[in-house]
Amino acid sequence: MPNFCNPIAFRLLSATNPYIMKKLLFVFAICLSITTQAQKAAKPAVAALPFDTSITAELKFRNIGPWRGGRSTAVVGDLQNDQLFYFGSTGGGVWKTNDGGSNWKNISDGYFGGSVGSIAVSKSDPSIIYAGMGENTMRGNVSEGFGMWKSENGGRSWKNVGLNDTRHIMRIVIHPKDENVIYVAALGHLFGPNAERGVFRSKNGGQSWEKILYVNDQVGACDLVIDPTDPNILLATFWNVKRTPFSLESGGPGSGIYKTIDGGNNWTNITKNKGLPQDTLGIIGITISASNPEIYYAIIESKTGGIFKSIDAGKTWTKTSDDSNQRQRAWYFSKIFCDPKNENVVYVLNVEFWKSTDGAKTFKSISTPHGDHHDLWIDPNNPQRMIIGDDGGAQTSFDGGYNWSTYHNQPTAQIYRVSTDNAVPYRIYGAQQDNTSLRIRHRSRGGQIDDNDWEPTAGFESGFIVASPINSEIVYGGNYSGFIGCINHKTGDARNITVWPNDPLGQGEGTQAYRYQWTFPLLFSPHKPRR
Protein backbone atom coordinates (compact mmCIF):
# COMPACT_ATOMS: atom_id res chain seq x y z
CA MET A 1 0.00 0.00 0.00
CA PRO A 2 1.43 3.44 -0.92
CA ASN A 3 2.57 5.76 1.81
CA PHE A 4 0.24 8.74 1.32
CA CYS A 5 2.35 10.88 3.60
CA ASN A 6 5.30 10.49 1.21
CA PRO A 7 5.42 13.47 -1.25
CA ILE A 8 6.80 11.31 -4.10
CA ALA A 9 3.96 8.81 -3.77
CA PHE A 10 1.54 11.74 -3.65
CA ARG A 11 2.83 13.18 -6.96
CA LEU A 12 2.71 9.81 -8.75
CA LEU A 13 -0.85 9.08 -7.73
CA SER A 14 -2.12 12.57 -8.57
CA ALA A 15 -0.57 12.40 -12.06
CA THR A 16 -2.11 9.05 -12.98
CA ASN A 17 -5.56 9.72 -11.51
CA PRO A 18 -6.60 13.40 -11.34
CA TYR A 19 -10.01 12.41 -9.94
CA ILE A 20 -8.59 11.69 -6.51
CA MET A 21 -6.49 14.86 -6.44
CA LYS A 22 -8.76 16.68 -3.99
CA LYS A 23 -9.00 13.74 -1.61
CA LEU A 24 -5.24 13.25 -1.67
CA LEU A 25 -4.71 16.91 -0.85
CA PHE A 26 -6.92 16.47 2.19
CA VAL A 27 -5.05 13.32 3.32
CA PHE A 28 -1.69 15.03 2.74
CA ALA A 29 -2.75 17.97 4.89
CA ILE A 30 -3.60 15.62 7.75
CA CYS A 31 -0.27 13.76 7.40
CA LEU A 32 1.62 17.06 7.35
CA SER A 33 -0.10 18.12 10.56
CA ILE A 34 0.74 14.80 12.27
CA THR A 35 4.37 15.00 11.15
CA THR A 36 4.67 18.56 12.44
CA GLN A 37 3.24 17.60 15.83
CA ALA A 38 5.62 14.61 16.06
CA GLN A 39 8.56 16.86 15.31
CA LYS A 40 7.47 19.20 18.07
CA ALA A 41 7.13 16.27 20.51
CA ALA A 42 10.59 15.01 19.61
CA LYS A 43 12.31 18.09 20.98
CA PRO A 44 14.87 17.28 23.68
CA ALA A 45 13.43 17.13 27.19
CA VAL A 46 14.30 19.87 29.61
CA ALA A 47 17.28 18.80 31.70
CA ALA A 48 16.48 17.79 35.26
CA LEU A 49 17.25 20.40 37.85
CA PRO A 50 20.33 19.53 39.89
CA PHE A 51 19.71 18.53 43.50
CA ASP A 52 21.87 20.15 46.11
CA THR A 53 22.85 17.22 48.34
CA SER A 54 24.18 19.59 50.99
CA ILE A 55 20.55 20.27 51.94
CA THR A 56 20.19 16.74 53.35
CA ALA A 57 23.82 16.11 54.29
CA GLU A 58 23.22 16.91 57.94
CA LEU A 59 20.03 14.88 58.26
CA LYS A 60 20.50 11.84 60.48
CA PHE A 61 18.25 8.95 61.38
CA ARG A 62 17.14 8.70 64.99
CA ASN A 63 15.49 5.86 66.83
CA ILE A 64 11.89 6.60 67.79
CA GLY A 65 11.07 3.07 68.97
CA PRO A 66 9.19 1.10 69.91
CA TRP A 67 11.60 -0.13 72.56
CA ARG A 68 9.96 -3.47 73.14
CA GLY A 69 11.87 -6.36 71.62
CA GLY A 70 11.24 -8.27 68.45
CA ARG A 71 11.70 -11.99 67.95
CA SER A 72 14.93 -13.55 69.25
CA THR A 73 15.97 -17.11 68.39
CA ALA A 74 19.54 -17.17 69.76
CA VAL A 75 20.72 -16.52 73.34
CA VAL A 76 23.86 -17.23 75.37
CA GLY A 77 25.60 -16.16 78.57
CA ASP A 78 29.19 -15.62 79.69
CA LEU A 79 30.56 -18.08 82.25
CA GLN A 80 33.07 -15.68 83.82
CA ASN A 81 30.73 -12.71 84.31
CA ASP A 82 27.26 -13.49 85.59
CA GLN A 83 25.93 -10.11 84.42
CA LEU A 84 27.05 -10.61 80.81
CA PHE A 85 24.63 -12.03 78.21
CA TYR A 86 24.13 -11.90 74.45
CA PHE A 87 21.16 -12.44 72.17
CA GLY A 88 20.63 -12.60 68.44
CA SER A 89 17.54 -10.99 66.95
CA THR A 90 15.74 -11.98 63.75
CA GLY A 91 15.73 -8.36 62.64
CA GLY A 92 18.14 -6.41 64.83
CA GLY A 93 21.49 -8.23 64.91
CA VAL A 94 23.48 -9.15 68.03
CA TRP A 95 22.95 -7.41 71.40
CA LYS A 96 24.93 -7.41 74.64
CA THR A 97 24.18 -6.57 78.26
CA ASN A 98 26.72 -6.01 81.02
CA ASP A 99 24.16 -5.53 83.78
CA GLY A 100 22.07 -8.67 83.72
CA GLY A 101 19.52 -7.46 81.17
CA SER A 102 18.70 -4.01 82.53
CA ASN A 103 20.27 -2.37 79.49
CA TRP A 104 21.15 -3.75 76.06
CA LYS A 105 23.49 -2.45 73.38
CA ASN A 106 23.74 -3.49 69.74
CA ILE A 107 27.25 -4.75 68.87
CA SER A 108 26.81 -5.82 65.24
CA ASP A 109 25.55 -2.80 63.30
CA GLY A 110 27.78 -2.03 60.36
CA TYR A 111 29.12 -5.57 60.11
CA PHE A 112 26.31 -7.92 59.10
CA GLY A 113 22.56 -8.13 58.65
CA GLY A 114 19.87 -8.36 61.28
CA SER A 115 18.80 -12.01 61.03
CA VAL A 116 20.72 -14.16 63.54
CA GLY A 117 20.13 -17.91 63.84
CA SER A 118 22.67 -18.92 66.48
CA ILE A 119 25.26 -17.38 68.79
CA ALA A 120 27.97 -19.01 70.91
CA VAL A 121 30.63 -17.83 73.37
CA SER A 122 33.84 -19.76 73.96
CA LYS A 123 34.16 -21.28 77.43
CA SER A 124 37.96 -21.30 77.25
CA ASP A 125 38.18 -17.70 75.98
CA PRO A 126 34.93 -15.71 76.45
CA SER A 127 36.22 -12.82 74.34
CA ILE A 128 35.62 -15.08 71.31
CA ILE A 129 32.05 -15.01 70.00
CA TYR A 130 30.55 -16.63 66.92
CA ALA A 131 27.30 -15.55 65.30
CA GLY A 132 25.56 -17.62 62.63
CA MET A 133 23.27 -15.80 60.26
CA GLY A 134 19.77 -16.67 59.08
CA GLU A 135 16.68 -17.05 61.22
CA ASN A 136 16.06 -20.60 62.49
CA THR A 137 12.26 -20.38 62.75
CA MET A 138 11.04 -21.33 59.29
CA ARG A 139 8.13 -18.96 58.82
CA GLY A 140 6.78 -17.91 55.45
CA ASN A 141 8.36 -14.48 56.03
CA VAL A 142 11.67 -15.89 57.27
CA SER A 143 14.87 -13.88 56.69
CA GLU A 144 17.98 -15.68 55.50
CA GLY A 145 21.53 -14.73 56.43
CA PHE A 146 25.10 -14.56 55.21
CA GLY A 147 27.33 -17.12 56.87
CA MET A 148 29.42 -17.13 60.03
CA TRP A 149 30.90 -14.13 61.83
CA LYS A 150 33.56 -14.08 64.52
CA SER A 151 34.57 -11.55 67.17
CA GLU A 152 37.79 -11.86 69.14
CA ASN A 153 37.20 -8.89 71.42
CA GLY A 154 33.82 -9.43 73.02
CA GLY A 155 31.82 -8.03 70.11
CA ARG A 156 33.66 -4.75 69.51
CA SER A 157 34.50 -5.84 65.96
CA TRP A 158 33.60 -8.75 63.67
CA LYS A 159 34.90 -10.57 60.63
CA ASN A 160 33.22 -12.98 58.24
CA VAL A 161 34.59 -16.53 58.44
CA GLY A 162 32.70 -18.27 55.65
CA LEU A 163 29.79 -20.68 55.15
CA ASN A 164 28.05 -17.86 53.31
CA ASP A 165 25.69 -20.07 51.28
CA THR A 166 24.26 -21.95 54.25
CA ARG A 167 21.52 -19.28 54.54
CA HIS A 168 20.19 -20.61 57.88
CA ILE A 169 22.61 -21.55 60.67
CA MET A 170 20.66 -23.39 63.34
CA ARG A 171 23.27 -24.07 66.03
CA ILE A 172 26.94 -23.33 66.82
CA VAL A 173 28.93 -25.49 69.24
CA ILE A 174 32.44 -24.53 70.42
CA HIS A 175 34.77 -27.13 71.89
CA PRO A 176 34.82 -26.44 75.65
CA LYS A 177 38.63 -26.62 75.91
CA ASP A 178 39.77 -25.46 72.47
CA GLU A 179 38.19 -22.28 71.08
CA ASN A 180 39.62 -23.05 67.62
CA VAL A 181 37.39 -26.12 67.17
CA ILE A 182 33.88 -25.13 66.11
CA TYR A 183 30.92 -27.16 64.90
CA VAL A 184 28.02 -25.67 62.92
CA ALA A 185 24.59 -27.11 62.09
CA ALA A 186 23.39 -25.52 58.84
CA LEU A 187 19.94 -26.03 57.37
CA GLY A 188 20.76 -24.60 53.94
CA HIS A 189 18.39 -22.99 51.47
CA LEU A 190 14.79 -23.12 52.63
CA PHE A 191 13.14 -22.51 49.26
CA GLY A 192 15.25 -24.92 47.21
CA PRO A 193 18.12 -27.42 47.19
CA ASN A 194 21.78 -26.55 47.74
CA ALA A 195 24.97 -28.34 48.74
CA GLU A 196 26.25 -26.09 51.55
CA ARG A 197 24.22 -27.66 54.34
CA GLY A 198 24.75 -30.25 57.06
CA VAL A 199 27.30 -30.28 59.90
CA PHE A 200 30.56 -28.38 59.42
CA ARG A 201 33.74 -28.32 61.50
CA SER A 202 36.63 -25.90 61.73
CA LYS A 203 39.86 -26.71 63.55
CA ASN A 204 41.49 -23.32 63.02
CA GLY A 205 39.04 -20.80 64.39
CA GLY A 206 36.96 -20.48 61.24
CA GLN A 207 39.78 -19.99 58.75
CA SER A 208 38.62 -23.09 56.88
CA TRP A 209 35.71 -25.52 57.12
CA GLU A 210 35.09 -29.17 56.35
CA LYS A 211 31.69 -30.73 55.83
CA ILE A 212 31.69 -33.70 58.21
CA LEU A 213 28.04 -34.82 57.96
CA TYR A 214 25.82 -34.48 54.91
CA VAL A 215 22.65 -36.27 53.79
CA ASN A 216 21.65 -34.63 50.51
CA ASP A 217 20.91 -31.23 48.98
CA GLN A 218 17.36 -31.13 50.40
CA VAL A 219 18.06 -32.15 54.00
CA GLY A 220 19.85 -29.90 56.48
CA ALA A 221 21.03 -30.00 60.09
CA CYS A 222 18.56 -28.49 62.56
CA ASP A 223 20.10 -29.14 66.00
CA LEU A 224 23.51 -29.98 67.41
CA VAL A 225 24.69 -30.71 70.97
CA ILE A 226 27.98 -31.76 72.54
CA ASP A 227 28.38 -34.06 75.53
CA PRO A 228 29.35 -31.75 78.42
CA THR A 229 31.55 -34.49 79.88
CA ASP A 230 33.16 -35.77 76.66
CA PRO A 231 33.62 -33.30 73.76
CA ASN A 232 34.24 -36.16 71.34
CA ILE A 233 30.57 -37.10 71.56
CA LEU A 234 28.07 -35.01 69.60
CA LEU A 235 24.48 -35.52 68.49
CA ALA A 236 23.09 -33.92 65.33
CA THR A 237 19.56 -33.92 63.99
CA PHE A 238 18.58 -33.50 60.35
CA TRP A 239 15.39 -32.14 58.82
CA ASN A 240 13.87 -32.56 55.39
CA VAL A 241 12.02 -29.27 54.97
CA LYS A 242 10.98 -27.02 52.12
CA ARG A 243 9.11 -23.73 51.93
CA THR A 244 7.20 -22.18 49.08
CA PRO A 245 5.54 -18.76 49.21
CA PHE A 246 2.28 -20.49 50.09
CA SER A 247 3.19 -23.76 51.84
CA LEU A 248 5.53 -25.65 54.17
CA GLU A 249 6.61 -29.27 53.61
CA SER A 250 8.05 -30.58 56.87
CA GLY A 251 9.37 -34.13 57.05
CA GLY A 252 10.62 -36.78 54.68
CA PRO A 253 13.56 -39.06 53.85
CA GLY A 254 16.80 -38.06 55.55
CA SER A 255 15.29 -36.60 58.71
CA GLY A 256 16.82 -38.26 61.75
CA ILE A 257 19.39 -38.40 64.57
CA TYR A 258 23.13 -38.95 64.12
CA LYS A 259 25.87 -39.58 66.69
CA THR A 260 29.66 -39.32 66.69
CA ILE A 261 32.09 -40.51 69.37
CA ASP A 262 35.28 -39.25 67.72
CA GLY A 263 34.70 -35.52 67.38
CA GLY A 264 32.88 -35.74 64.06
CA ASN A 265 35.20 -37.92 61.99
CA ASN A 266 32.62 -40.70 61.81
CA TRP A 267 28.87 -40.66 62.37
CA THR A 268 26.23 -43.30 63.06
CA ASN A 269 22.57 -42.93 62.13
CA ILE A 270 20.67 -43.93 65.27
CA THR A 271 17.21 -43.04 63.93
CA LYS A 272 16.20 -46.70 63.64
CA ASN A 273 17.12 -47.50 67.23
CA LYS A 274 14.48 -49.17 69.36
CA GLY A 275 11.74 -46.93 70.67
CA LEU A 276 12.01 -44.07 68.17
CA PRO A 277 9.18 -43.33 65.69
CA GLN A 278 9.54 -45.24 62.43
CA ASP A 279 7.12 -43.20 60.35
CA THR A 280 7.87 -39.93 58.52
CA LEU A 281 9.99 -37.65 60.69
CA GLY A 282 10.09 -33.86 60.66
CA ILE A 283 12.05 -31.47 62.84
CA ILE A 284 13.89 -32.90 65.87
CA GLY A 285 15.30 -31.13 68.93
CA ILE A 286 17.78 -32.94 71.17
CA THR A 287 19.75 -32.52 74.42
CA ILE A 288 22.22 -34.42 76.64
CA SER A 289 22.12 -34.38 80.43
CA ALA A 290 25.31 -32.92 81.91
CA SER A 291 24.72 -34.59 85.28
CA ASN A 292 24.18 -38.02 83.67
CA PRO A 293 25.48 -38.09 80.07
CA GLU A 294 23.85 -41.46 79.41
CA ILE A 295 20.50 -39.65 79.36
CA TYR A 296 19.31 -38.06 76.13
CA TYR A 297 16.02 -36.28 75.48
CA ALA A 298 14.52 -35.63 72.05
CA ILE A 299 11.37 -33.90 70.86
CA ILE A 300 10.32 -35.37 67.51
CA GLU A 301 7.80 -34.21 64.94
CA SER A 302 5.90 -37.15 63.44
CA LYS A 303 2.47 -38.75 63.51
CA THR A 304 3.63 -40.90 66.44
CA GLY A 305 6.01 -38.28 67.78
CA GLY A 306 6.39 -36.57 71.11
CA ILE A 307 9.14 -36.41 73.72
CA PHE A 308 11.50 -39.38 73.95
CA LYS A 309 14.11 -40.33 76.55
CA SER A 310 17.13 -42.62 76.38
CA ILE A 311 18.97 -43.83 79.48
CA ASP A 312 21.68 -45.71 77.57
CA ALA A 313 23.24 -42.98 75.39
CA GLY A 314 20.79 -43.40 72.53
CA LYS A 315 20.74 -47.19 72.14
CA THR A 316 17.08 -47.46 73.16
CA TRP A 317 14.34 -44.89 73.69
CA THR A 318 11.03 -44.53 75.52
CA LYS A 319 8.27 -42.06 74.77
CA THR A 320 7.64 -40.03 77.92
CA SER A 321 5.00 -37.59 76.65
CA ASP A 322 2.89 -36.83 73.60
CA ASP A 323 1.20 -33.77 75.10
CA SER A 324 0.19 -31.46 72.24
CA ASN A 325 1.04 -28.39 74.33
CA GLN A 326 4.72 -29.10 73.74
CA ARG A 327 4.27 -30.23 70.11
CA GLN A 328 2.08 -27.61 68.45
CA ARG A 329 3.55 -25.86 65.39
CA ALA A 330 6.56 -28.17 65.59
CA TRP A 331 8.39 -26.45 62.70
CA TYR A 332 8.38 -23.20 64.69
CA PHE A 333 9.55 -24.61 68.03
CA SER A 334 10.81 -28.15 68.90
CA LYS A 335 13.60 -27.14 71.28
CA ILE A 336 14.40 -29.16 74.41
CA PHE A 337 16.95 -28.57 77.20
CA CYS A 338 18.06 -30.42 80.34
CA ASP A 339 19.04 -28.84 83.64
CA PRO A 340 22.84 -29.23 83.93
CA LYS A 341 22.62 -30.31 87.58
CA ASN A 342 19.45 -32.45 87.55
CA GLU A 343 18.77 -35.08 84.89
CA ASN A 344 15.03 -35.06 85.62
CA VAL A 345 14.49 -31.33 85.08
CA VAL A 346 13.65 -30.73 81.44
CA TYR A 347 12.55 -27.58 79.61
CA VAL A 348 10.57 -27.51 76.36
CA LEU A 349 10.03 -24.33 74.38
CA ASN A 350 6.72 -23.65 72.66
CA VAL A 351 4.03 -20.98 72.87
CA GLU A 352 4.50 -21.38 76.61
CA PHE A 353 7.68 -22.16 78.55
CA TRP A 354 7.31 -25.71 79.87
CA LYS A 355 9.20 -27.31 82.77
CA SER A 356 9.24 -30.94 83.89
CA THR A 357 10.70 -32.22 87.16
CA ASP A 358 9.97 -35.92 86.56
CA GLY A 359 12.08 -36.74 83.53
CA ALA A 360 9.76 -35.25 80.87
CA LYS A 361 6.67 -37.21 81.88
CA THR A 362 4.60 -34.20 82.92
CA PHE A 363 5.09 -30.49 82.40
CA LYS A 364 4.07 -27.26 84.07
CA SER A 365 3.91 -23.87 82.37
CA ILE A 366 6.37 -21.26 83.69
CA SER A 367 5.32 -17.62 83.35
CA THR A 368 7.50 -15.43 81.12
CA PRO A 369 7.17 -11.83 79.89
CA HIS A 370 6.30 -12.89 76.33
CA GLY A 371 5.08 -15.90 74.37
CA ASP A 372 6.48 -18.12 71.59
CA HIS A 373 9.83 -19.29 72.97
CA HIS A 374 12.72 -20.22 70.68
CA ASP A 375 15.99 -20.59 72.58
CA LEU A 376 17.26 -21.11 76.11
CA TRP A 377 20.70 -20.97 77.71
CA ILE A 378 21.24 -22.32 81.22
CA ASP A 379 24.44 -21.60 83.12
CA PRO A 380 26.12 -25.02 83.54
CA ASN A 381 27.57 -23.91 86.88
CA ASN A 382 24.41 -22.26 88.22
CA PRO A 383 21.10 -23.48 86.73
CA GLN A 384 19.24 -20.63 88.41
CA ARG A 385 20.90 -18.26 85.94
CA MET A 386 19.40 -18.38 82.45
CA ILE A 387 18.36 -16.37 79.41
CA ILE A 388 15.42 -17.11 77.14
CA GLY A 389 14.69 -15.92 73.60
CA ASP A 390 11.12 -15.47 72.44
CA ASP A 391 8.91 -13.39 70.17
CA GLY A 392 9.45 -10.42 72.49
CA GLY A 393 13.24 -10.50 72.44
CA ALA A 394 15.40 -11.84 75.28
CA GLN A 395 14.94 -11.88 79.05
CA THR A 396 17.24 -13.02 81.85
CA SER A 397 16.48 -14.79 85.12
CA PHE A 398 18.59 -15.41 88.21
CA ASP A 399 16.08 -17.56 90.10
CA GLY A 400 15.34 -20.40 87.72
CA GLY A 401 12.65 -18.63 85.73
CA TYR A 402 10.40 -17.27 88.46
CA ASN A 403 11.36 -13.68 87.73
CA TRP A 404 12.58 -12.19 84.45
CA SER A 405 14.09 -8.97 83.19
CA THR A 406 12.03 -6.70 80.94
CA TYR A 407 11.98 -6.75 77.14
CA HIS A 408 11.00 -3.07 76.93
CA ASN A 409 14.64 -2.07 76.57
CA GLN A 410 15.69 -3.60 73.24
CA PRO A 411 14.49 -1.83 70.07
CA THR A 412 14.60 -4.82 67.72
CA ALA A 413 11.01 -4.64 66.45
CA GLN A 414 10.21 -5.96 62.99
CA ILE A 415 7.87 -3.34 61.50
CA TYR A 416 5.95 -4.44 58.42
CA ARG A 417 4.75 -1.15 56.95
CA VAL A 418 5.14 2.49 57.87
CA SER A 419 2.58 5.18 57.04
CA THR A 420 1.74 8.70 58.17
CA ASP A 421 -1.44 10.74 58.52
CA ASN A 422 -2.44 14.36 57.86
CA ALA A 423 -2.53 15.48 61.49
CA VAL A 424 -0.41 18.35 62.79
CA PRO A 425 1.99 17.20 64.13
CA TYR A 426 1.70 14.16 61.90
CA ARG A 427 1.69 10.66 63.32
CA ILE A 428 3.65 7.59 62.26
CA TYR A 429 1.95 4.18 62.02
CA GLY A 430 3.34 0.65 61.91
CA ALA A 431 2.57 -2.98 62.73
CA GLN A 432 5.11 -4.88 64.84
CA GLN A 433 5.57 -8.59 64.21
CA ASP A 434 4.60 -10.70 67.25
CA ASN A 435 3.17 -7.67 69.05
CA THR A 436 0.59 -5.05 68.05
CA SER A 437 0.05 -2.16 65.69
CA LEU A 438 1.20 1.26 66.93
CA ARG A 439 1.06 4.96 66.23
CA ILE A 440 3.06 7.91 67.54
CA ARG A 441 3.42 11.65 66.88
CA HIS A 442 6.64 12.45 65.08
CA ARG A 443 7.58 14.83 67.89
CA SER A 444 6.66 15.17 71.53
CA ARG A 445 6.40 18.03 74.00
CA GLY A 446 9.09 16.53 76.18
CA GLY A 447 11.85 16.93 73.63
CA GLN A 448 12.31 13.21 73.13
CA ILE A 449 10.14 10.27 72.13
CA ASP A 450 9.95 7.33 74.51
CA ASP A 451 7.76 4.29 75.08
CA ASN A 452 5.05 6.37 76.77
CA ASP A 453 4.42 8.28 73.54
CA TRP A 454 3.31 5.18 71.64
CA GLU A 455 -0.27 3.94 71.61
CA PRO A 456 -2.01 0.93 70.02
CA THR A 457 -4.16 1.47 66.96
CA ALA A 458 -6.22 -0.52 64.45
CA GLY A 459 -5.13 -3.89 63.11
CA PHE A 460 -2.56 -6.15 64.64
CA GLU A 461 0.92 -7.56 64.05
CA SER A 462 1.16 -8.10 60.29
CA GLY A 463 -1.03 -5.57 58.52
CA PHE A 464 -0.98 -2.30 56.67
CA ILE A 465 -2.16 0.63 58.80
CA VAL A 466 -3.81 3.65 57.14
CA ALA A 467 -5.48 6.72 58.62
CA SER A 468 -8.43 8.41 56.95
CA PRO A 469 -7.25 11.36 54.83
CA ILE A 470 -10.28 13.30 56.07
CA ASN A 471 -10.14 12.47 59.78
CA SER A 472 -6.82 11.24 61.16
CA GLU A 473 -8.48 9.95 64.31
CA ILE A 474 -10.15 7.20 62.24
CA VAL A 475 -7.65 4.45 61.46
CA TYR A 476 -7.94 1.20 59.51
CA GLY A 477 -5.63 -1.76 60.07
CA GLY A 478 -5.17 -5.25 58.69
CA ASN A 479 -3.88 -8.54 60.04
CA TYR A 480 -3.22 -12.04 58.77
CA SER A 481 -6.15 -14.18 57.54
CA GLY A 482 -7.85 -11.15 56.02
CA PHE A 483 -8.89 -9.40 59.23
CA ILE A 484 -9.54 -5.67 58.88
CA GLY A 485 -10.41 -3.44 61.81
CA CYS A 486 -11.35 0.21 62.24
CA ILE A 487 -10.90 2.37 65.32
CA ASN A 488 -11.97 5.92 66.11
CA HIS A 489 -9.36 7.20 68.54
CA LYS A 490 -11.50 10.19 69.52
CA THR A 491 -14.54 8.17 70.59
CA GLY A 492 -12.83 4.88 71.37
CA ASP A 493 -15.23 2.97 69.12
CA ALA A 494 -13.81 -0.04 67.28
CA ARG A 495 -15.38 -2.41 64.77
CA ASN A 496 -14.56 -5.33 62.51
CA ILE A 497 -14.95 -4.57 58.80
CA THR A 498 -13.39 -7.75 57.41
CA VAL A 499 -14.44 -8.45 53.80
CA TRP A 500 -15.56 -11.98 54.71
CA PRO A 501 -16.65 -11.97 58.36
CA ASN A 502 -16.11 -15.65 59.24
CA ASP A 503 -13.16 -16.38 61.51
CA PRO A 504 -10.80 -18.40 59.28
CA LEU A 505 -8.47 -19.65 62.03
CA GLY A 506 -8.56 -23.43 62.27
CA GLN A 507 -10.70 -23.86 59.16
CA GLY A 508 -9.74 -25.58 55.91
CA GLU A 509 -9.08 -23.51 52.82
CA GLY A 510 -12.13 -25.02 51.10
CA THR A 511 -14.43 -23.17 53.52
CA GLN A 512 -12.95 -19.76 52.76
CA ALA A 513 -14.55 -17.38 50.30
CA TYR A 514 -11.26 -15.50 49.85
CA ARG A 515 -7.62 -16.20 50.54
CA TYR A 516 -5.19 -13.59 51.85
CA GLN A 517 -1.45 -13.31 52.14
CA TRP A 518 0.12 -12.86 55.58
CA THR A 519 0.18 -9.12 54.93
CA PHE A 520 -2.10 -7.49 52.37
CA PRO A 521 -2.36 -3.85 51.24
CA LEU A 522 -4.82 -1.23 52.46
CA LEU A 523 -4.93 2.23 50.90
CA PHE A 524 -7.17 5.21 50.20
CA SER A 525 -7.72 6.68 46.76
CA PRO A 526 -5.73 9.92 46.37
CA HIS A 527 -8.58 11.25 44.21
CA LYS A 528 -11.59 10.17 46.27
CA PRO A 529 -10.52 10.04 49.92
CA ARG A 530 -13.68 8.25 51.04
CA ARG A 531 -12.68 5.20 48.99
Residue map of PLM features:
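Bacterial Sec-dependent N-terminal signal peptides
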Residues: 1-42
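Beta-propeller blade termini and top-face loops
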Residues: 39-531
